[in-house]
């Protein structure tokens, strides 16, 4: 997966509908359901049907950077816009990005491990104060950062979501909880989508089953 070098500003790229995104190549990813066996909640394991998890089957990803900031645009089909909890089984739509915090080959389906933690960027349609930056060292171990270095904006229309994440390539002051990126470098990367109308939340979601390698154009 290529992260294209662009000359546009963060303000421009944060708009999911910006014309600047039309020149950034995209890659379509097949999404799989998270395994029920990996859910930390016994209630979830007992109450969910594995065949009903992972409603979103395909995700389009575009990546770009301007030498200072990195941007990801995630788009997927969704015939319903869910922006709040409206029933016991209806939750807000969301999406996320997963990157190994310290390199290595963490188990993507288990949210990393003690020796190989992962950094997750999380957007959800109901979060009024912005996205979340988290670190995980295995299932059920997610810790939210007090300070989030990420910006995100999502729009829904014509039966689809488009969400853009933006962050400085380097966040040296948060090196223990935010992956450091640089032009010419490469990292493993994964993605997740939560379909709220399908009762998806927490560990119940669609995800990219294998790591992809993201190469940042020099």
Regions found by a protein language model. Name each.
Residues 64, 73-75, 98, 155, ...:
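Residue-level recognition of well-ordered beta-strand positions that form the cores
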Residues 2-41, 84-157, 198, 202-218:
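Extracellular/luminal beta-rich ligand-recognition
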Residues 16, 69-76, 161-167:
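Short, well-ordered beta-strand segments enriched in hydrophobic/aromatic residues
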Residues 21, 29, 59, 67-71, ...:
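Primarily extracytoplasmic ectodomains and periplasmic/lumenal surface modules that are beta-strand-rich
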Residues 45-57, 145-148:
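Short linear interaction motifs
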Residues 159-202:
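Ser/Thr/Pro-rich, low-complexity mucin-like regions
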Residues 36-44, 75-79, 168-170:
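Generic short beta-strand segments
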Residues 65-68, 102-103, 156-161, 181-185:
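A short, structured loop/turn motif at beta-sheet edges
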